[in-house]
Amino acid sequence: MPYLEERFSTAMPPGSRERRPRVLYLAYYFPPSRASGVFRARATANHFAEAGWDVTVYTAPREFFETYLDDACDRSLEDTVDPRVTTVRPPMSYYAWEKDIRQFGKFRRNFPTVSASLYKLFQSKVFPEHYLTWIPGVISSAVKAHFKQKFDLIIATGNPFVSFAAAQALGRLLKIPYAVDYRDSWTFNQFTEELKFKEDSKAFEWEAKVLRDASEVVFVNDGMRQWHINRYPYAAERMTVVPNGWEPELLGEGEYAPPVESRPLRFGYLGTVTSYLPLEELFDGWRIARSHPLLQDAELNIHGHLGFFPGDVAPLKERLPLDENIGVHYRGAFDKTEGRELYAQTDALVFCVPGARYVTSGKVFEYMASGKPVVSVHKPHIAATEVLEGYPLWFHGDELTAEDVAKSFIAAAEAARQVDPTRYAVAVKHAHSYTRAATLGPWEQRMRKLVEGTS
């Protein structure tokens, strides 16, 4: 990948110290995983490495993704990790995921019910997350690595949130600062806006402890930050927002292409299809919009995985009107590195996300970077609208109804046929405010000052 090789030079930045600051980055989901949070984790590790840090990533064992998650991998992503990043995969127990009785320990084989009860009790009393078994290997390995070559900083990204607990434990043990990055919320559901745990759960006790000691607490949008300020006001001054973004080294710097009027319009949804998406409103709106001359023969192509696990595929596929002859096609999954070509082949993009005010979605940044019309299919006033404000090719309704969705499709179709170089340039300029370098840069600088102030 020449564009990646060119980006990942080995030169130190001007004015850098002789010894690079060393960061331990705890990111359970990291390439080759294809989980949605991987892209932010990958970008963070790469950005810090490019800024002159010595980056060590602790992530899950490869077999977790390949065996226990049924090969939920995108191996092309591994090629996009900066070669200066060191990746370590501490071992762990797969108790919660192991289904092969031949792999059970003697006690679990002979007393499965008792074993399950003890495991559940242990979680409720210690840490309510299956990934807890990752912590011992992380702490053991990190302590040994630290005494060989000192870490200056720990950054943990969640979910899962055992990474936060490990960061807090290591920070106290090694007496170094740590920051936590909330890609998702820990104790409340971003989609239903309800608490995930009872108030007396260990999860709240751990979250309070983590936020009490963290040097910085990062969120992907201000809605999430405000929710946590209300619950943990003592940490408010250390809470910041680092938005998601997009990667020019993956998507390339697009060029204006005049509308192709000799073929039907191609609308595209690029991303994982999940049960939370408002698919009924999307396809009902599409059916109505098809009565417009510009959309009578248009295509709506779905690119991406159906859910995150094998059991998600069948029920999600049933919700796609593939047999109605209305131009809806499921094109299958694609590697991250294939995204550039798919965006180039698409005339307008469909931004369909769950309707919660705390949801941004990383995909919206790539959509804007394409310079193509974007059709919003979600409730109004979600966090993503803060990002889309100012994007000149954004089409959305006042409500999440089939009628409003249809109007947005029609407006986007007209824009796709009429877009000119000037409007395209304004759209791309807006997107450039959200490159990973733009969003991660100020955070990296704050972390550098933090390290320099404690060294």
Question: What do the predicted segments below correspond to?
Answer:
Residues 301-306, 310-338:
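Nucleotide-activated donor-binding/catalytic signature segment of Leloir-type glycosyltransferases, i.e.
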Residues 2-95, 216, 437-438, 455:
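N-terminal subdomain of nucleotide-sugar transferases
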Residues 215, 325, 341-358:
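Acidic donor-binding loop of glycosyltransferase active sites
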Residues 24, 259-277, 283-287:
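Conserved donor-binding/catalytic core segment of Leloir-type glycosyltransferases
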Residues 223, 245:
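Carbohydrate-associated surface elements
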